[in-house]
Amino acid sequence: MMHKHEAKIIWERKDQPFVDNKYSRAHLWEFDGVKVPASSSPAVLPVPLSSADAIDPEEALVAATSSCHMLFFLAIAAKQGFIVDHYNDQAYGVM
């Protein structure tokens, strides 16, 4: 069964220069009406071209993978009759 997943990505140039490649990469992700500040990673583009307080795509990929792993683990544990009271994963990715 296929499911449709949607995300809205919002970025505005405002009064920033653009053609010199010195524009902010800060933008918003919107899921189900919730807006999440996002940006390129400061490790890739330094502040002020990126926002250190925002989630970057690399972090989101690591978090999504970890979240999927947790949900899969919890489903298997429940189906096998195990009780899980707590789950904590300090996920990291190297890219």
PLM segments and residue spans:
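Extended beta-strand/beta-hairpin segments
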Residues: 1-63, 74-95
